[in-house]
């Protein structure tokens, strides 16, 4: 790896990142959609295939998870206008947010209460389908609800699934795998919250805890799975299936925007702010949105100041060859879902030509935003899910991106969507603790 001093000279923004300051990075490598898609390893066909698979499984999902009955087994979340929060942001940051502000509540996705219910559940279902088809338990024409049987559960019990996680991915993989009948092991890093471990164990999931961070948990999970031919490892750092499961969100969002009569075109740009850990969730969603809205959607990743792995990987072009620890950042943050020191090389390289930018936000800011959203809209998210909330303020305030893309006039007719990635499953006492922290920090700031 290039000497750190050389990197600092080449990329002056690194100095601020090393000081854990909040920064906004505009991606100089973003290309026009038509150019970017030509070199992409994934296509619209891949996303369509994932969408169809989720449809095939809908009857099974509706049967085993009654909370999805209303949506006929489609796992989807609300898209809400948050005008009171918008006013509060404008007042607190003394910055008008140009355009409308909405919250995509993946925090309230059924089954596992986070964005990971998209990719994680999809990858487990795809694996289950492949096994069932190979062994004649199922044909693609069948009603997939037949998988809810003792025979099928006994069949899946011969196989195991493993994953490394800081929390939410473990929840979605664990809950789904256990429901189908798989033996499932979740390798959890030191920053994983206790309640997430407890919940998984209550569902019959084997949880292995590590003193080290996320990358170590993934590495160990991968190593153990490699030694067992009947074990399938969900590889959060490299998985195309996870990525495609997330990408399906875009066409669902398109339908919701149409229902709200919100136009997205050249004169009405869409800005989307996505909390980013290793990169799969935000990368997949952003990729799906680019397929639909091309150059009229502008996607930004949001990371904690203590774990800006994707920003560093993208900015230096080193991707997964550099970790935040290499430049002296500790990767310690209360935003547990984003506490990742080394980004996914696959996601970084795939998203590099599509991504508008990436910014960092401090833990203190996340807690203040958590309290503000609860006070103004009565919506409770976990700290990491608030990383997107400051995005519209940043992009409007530091308007380098808007200037560069000639959006200064258009942004007022545009729409900002903050992706709320998790929170509905947080136990009440834990959420109260988060709120109190936000309250204390708000008083301190004033």
Swiss-Prot record:
GO molecular function annotation: D-serine ammonia-lyase activity; hydro-lyase activity; pyridoxal phosphate binding
Enzyme class of the recorded protein, top EC level: lyase
Keyword Lyase belongs to the record: yes
Obligatory cofactor(s): pyridoxal 5'-phosphate
Transmembrane segments: none
Catalytic reaction equation(s): D-serine = pyruvate + NH4(+)
Listed EC numbers: 4.3.1.18
Pfam families in the record: PALP
InterPro entries cross-referenced by the UniProt entry: D_Ser_am_lyase, Ser/Thr_Dehydratase, Ser/Thr_deHydtase_PyrdxlP-BS, TrpB-like_PALP, TrpB-like_PALP_sf
Entry keywords, A to Z: Lyase, Pyridoxal phosphate
GO BP, one annotated term: isoleucine biosynthetic process
Family (UniProt): Belongs to the serine/threonine dehydratase family. DsdA subfamily.
Entry protein name: Probable D-serine dehydratase
Gene name for this UniProt entry: dsdA
């Amino acid at each position: 790896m290039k000497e750190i001093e050389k990197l600092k000279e080449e990329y002056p923004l690194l100095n601020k990142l090393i000081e854990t300051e909040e920064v906004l990075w505009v991606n100089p490598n973003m290309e026009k959609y038509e150019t970017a898609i030509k070199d992409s390893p994934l296509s619209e066909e891949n996303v369509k295939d994932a969408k169809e698979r989720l449809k095939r499984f809908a009857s099974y999902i509706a049967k085993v998870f009654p909370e999805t009955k209303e949506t006929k087994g489609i796992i989807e979340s609300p898209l809400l206008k948050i005008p009171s929060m918008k006013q509060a942001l404008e007042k607190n940051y003394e910055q008008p947010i140009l355009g409308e502000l909405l919250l995509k509540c993946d925090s309230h996705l059924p089954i596992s209460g986070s964005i990971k219910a998209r990719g994680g559940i999809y990858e487990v279902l795809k694996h289950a389908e492949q096994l069932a088809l190979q062994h004649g338990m199922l044909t693609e024409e069948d009603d997939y609800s037949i998988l809810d049987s003792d025979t099928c559960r006994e069949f899946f019990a011969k196989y195991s699934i493993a994953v490394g996680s800081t929390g939410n991915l473990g929840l979605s993989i664990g809950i789904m795998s256990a429901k189908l009948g798989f033996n499932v092991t979740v390798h959890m890093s030191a920053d994983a919250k206790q309640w997430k471990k407890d919940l998984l164990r209550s569902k019959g999931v084997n949880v292995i805890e590590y003193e080290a961070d996320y990358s170590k948990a993934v590495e160990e999970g991968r190593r153990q799975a490699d030694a067992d031919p009947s074990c399938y490892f969900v590889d959060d750092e490299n998985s195309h299936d996870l990525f495609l499961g997330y990408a399906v969100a875009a066409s669902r969002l398109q339908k919701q925007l149409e229902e709200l009569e919100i136009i997205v075109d050249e004169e009405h740009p869409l800005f989307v702010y996505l909390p980013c850990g290793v990169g799969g969730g935000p990368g997949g969603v952003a990729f799906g949105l680019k397929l639909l809205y091309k150059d009229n959607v502008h996607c930004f990743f949001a990371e904690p100041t203590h774990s800006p792995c994707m920003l560093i990987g993208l900015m230096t072009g080193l991707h997964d060859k550099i970790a935040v620890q290499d430049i002296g950042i500790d990767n310690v943050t209360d935003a547990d879902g984003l506490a990742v020191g080394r980004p996914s090389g696959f996601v970084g390289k795939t998203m590099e030509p599509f991504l508008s930018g990436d910014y960092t936000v401090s833990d203190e800011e996340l807690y203040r935003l958590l309290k503000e959203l609860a006070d103004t809209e009565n919506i409770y998210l976990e700290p990491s899910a608030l990383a997107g909330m400051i995005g519209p303020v940043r992009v409007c305030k530091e308007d380098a991106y808007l200037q560069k893309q000639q959006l200064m006039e258009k942004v007022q007719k545009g729409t900002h969507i903050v992706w709320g990635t998790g929170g509905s499953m947080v136990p009440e006492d834990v959420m109260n603790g988060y709120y109190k922290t936000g309250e204390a920090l708000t008083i301190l700031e004033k």
